[in-house]
Amino acid sequence: MAMAMANHHTLGLIFGILGNIISFLVYFAPAPTFYRIYKRKSAEGFHSLPYIVALFSAMLWLYYALLKKDAFLLITINSFGCAIESFYILLYFFYAPMQAKKQTLKVVISLNVGVFSILVVLIQFLLKGSNRINVFGWICASFSVAVFAAPLSIVAKVIRTKSVEFMPFSLSFFLTLSAIMWFAYGLLKNDPCVAIPNILGVILGLVQMVLYGFYRNAGKEKMEKKLPEHIIDMVMLSTLGTSDIHPIGAQQNGIKKSGSEDVKDDEETGNREKSTENSGELQPNGSTV
C-alpha cells in the first residue's frame, strides 16, 4: 500500500514537471508576435484580450494552488504565467494606440482587479477549510472549460474553409501534450478540478490534429491558387483563444512593378512574419494549469 502511494506520488511529480516544461514552451508561443510589435513600435491591429484572459486564468490557478497543500508545481507554472502575461500586456499597452490603451485598462481593472478581488473576498469570508478549496477549485475548472471550448470556432472555420492556415499543427500538438500531462497530474493527485478541464483539452487538441491531417493538402492547393492574385495583410484578432481573420489591407500582386530584388525580399519577409504572428496569436495559452 505504501509502495503504491509512493509510486503515485512519484508519477504525479513526473507528470507535473513535464506539464511545467511544456506549459513554459506554450507561454512563449506569442513571443514572435510581440517581437514584431516591438520592431514596428506599434500594436495597431492586435488585441490584448487573449493575454488579459490568460493572465486572469493564471491568477485563478495560482490562488487555488496557494489554498492547497503540496501544490508547488501549480504555483511555479502559474507564477511564471502571471509574470509573462503581464509582460505581454505591458508591452502591448506601451505600443498600442490611445483608444486601445483605454480599452485594455478598462478590461484589466474590471476582470483582473475587480472580478478577481471579489472572488477572493467572497471565498475568504464566506467559506472555510476544505470548502474554500473545493469551491474555488471548481470556479477555476469552470473557467478553464470555457477557455478550452472557445477554440471550437477555429475548428468550425477549418471545416468551413477547408484550410488549416490559421491552425498551426505545432501549437495544437503542444497544447494537447500539455493537457495530457496536467490531466495525468490531476488524476494521480486526486484533484478533479485539474483533471476534468484537461479531458476537454485533450479531446479538442486531438480533433484539431486530425483536422490538420485531413485538410492540410486542400489548404495548400487553395493557397497556391490565391497567392498569385493577391497579397493580403491580415491580423488574427483573438477572443478567449478564438480567432477571426480580418483583412486590413490588400494589394494586387503587381502593385509595385519595379522588378527590384528589395520589393521581392520585403514581400517574402512579410509573409514569413505574418505566418509567425498567426501561430503566436492563435491560442495564446488559453488554459493552463
UniProtKB/Swiss-Prot annotation:
<feature type="topological domain" description="Extracellular">
    <location>
        <begin position="189"/>
        <end position="193"/>
    </location>
</feature>
<dbReference type="InterPro" id="IPR047664">
    <property type="entry name" value="SWEET"/>
</dbReference>
<feature type="topological domain" description="Cytoplasmic">
    <location>
        <begin position="156"/>
        <end position="167"/>
    </location>
</feature>
<dbReference type="GO" id="GO:0071446">
    <property type="term" value="P:cellular response to salicylic acid stimulus"/>
</dbReference>
<keyword id="KW-0762">Sugar transport</keyword>
<feature type="region of interest" description="Disordered">
    <location>
        <begin position="249"/>
        <end position="289"/>
    </location>
</feature>
<dbReference type="GO" id="GO:0071215">
    <property type="term" value="P:cellular response to abscisic acid stimulus"/>
</dbReference>
<dbReference type="GO" id="GO:0010431">
    <property type="term" value="P:seed maturation"/>
</dbReference>
<feature type="transmembrane region" description="Helical; Name=6">
    <location>
        <begin position="168"/>
        <end position="188"/>
    </location>
</feature>
<feature type="transmembrane region" description="Helical; Name=4">
    <location>
        <begin position="107"/>
        <end position="127"/>
    </location>
</feature>
<keyword id="KW-0813">Transport</keyword>
<dbReference type="GO" id="GO:0008515">
    <property type="term" value="F:sucrose transmembrane transporter activity"/>
</dbReference>
<feature type="topological domain" description="Extracellular">
    <location>
        <begin position="1"/>
        <end position="10"/>
    </location>
</feature>
<keyword id="KW-0812">Transmembrane</keyword>
<keyword id="KW-1133">Transmembrane helix</keyword>
<comment type="subunit">
    <text>Forms homooligomers and/or heterooligomers.</text>
</comment>
<keyword id="KW-1003">Cell membrane</keyword>
<feature type="domain" description="MtN3/slv 1">
    <location>
        <begin position="14"/>
        <end position="100"/>
    </location>
</feature>
<dbReference type="GO" id="GO:0008643">
    <property type="term" value="P:carbohydrate transport"/>
</dbReference>
<dbReference type="GO" id="GO:0010150">
    <property type="term" value="P:leaf senescence"/>
</dbReference>
<feature type="topological domain" description="Cytoplasmic">
    <location>
        <begin position="92"/>
        <end position="106"/>
    </location>
</feature>
<dbReference type="GO" id="GO:0009793">
    <property type="term" value="P:embryo development ending in seed dormancy"/>
</dbReference>
<dbReference type="InterPro" id="IPR004316">
    <property type="entry name" value="SWEET_rpt"/>
</dbReference>
<protein>
    <recommendedName>
        <fullName>Bidirectional sugar transporter SWEET15</fullName>
    </recommendedName>
</protein>
<feature type="topological domain" description="Cytoplasmic">
    <location>
        <begin position="215"/>
        <end position="289"/>
    </location>
</feature>
<keyword id="KW-0677">Repeat</keyword>
<dbReference type="GO" id="GO:0071470">
    <property type="term" value="P:cellular response to osmotic stress"/>
</dbReference>
<feature type="domain" description="MtN3/slv 2">
    <location>
        <begin position="136"/>
        <end position="219"/>
    </location>
</feature>
<keyword id="KW-0472">Membrane</keyword>
<feature type="topological domain" description="Extracellular">
    <location>
        <begin position="128"/>
        <end position="134"/>
    </location>
</feature>
<feature type="transmembrane region" description="Helical; Name=3">
    <location>
        <begin position="71"/>
        <end position="91"/>
    </location>
</feature>
<feature type="transmembrane region" description="Helical; Name=7">
    <location>
        <begin position="194"/>
        <end position="214"/>
    </location>
</feature>
<feature type="transmembrane region" description="Helical; Name=5">
    <location>
        <begin position="135"/>
        <end position="155"/>
    </location>
</feature>
<comment type="similarity">
    <text>Belongs to the SWEET sugar transporter family.</text>
</comment>
<dbReference type="Pfam" id="PF03083">
    <property type="entry name" value="MtN3_slv"/>
</dbReference>
<dbReference type="GO" id="GO:0005886">
    <property type="term" value="C:plasma membrane"/>
</dbReference>
<feature type="transmembrane region" description="Helical; Name=2">
    <location>
        <begin position="46"/>
        <end position="66"/>
    </location>
</feature>
<feature type="topological domain" description="Cytoplasmic">
    <location>
        <begin position="32"/>
        <end position="45"/>
    </location>
</feature>
<feature type="compositionally biased region" description="Polar residues">
    <location>
        <begin position="277"/>
        <end position="289"/>
    </location>
</feature>
<dbReference type="GO" id="GO:0000139">
    <property type="term" value="C:Golgi membrane"/>
</dbReference>
<dbReference type="GO" id="GO:0016020">
    <property type="term" value="C:membrane"/>
</dbReference>
<feature type="topological domain" description="Extracellular">
    <location>
        <begin position="67"/>
        <end position="70"/>
    </location>
</feature>
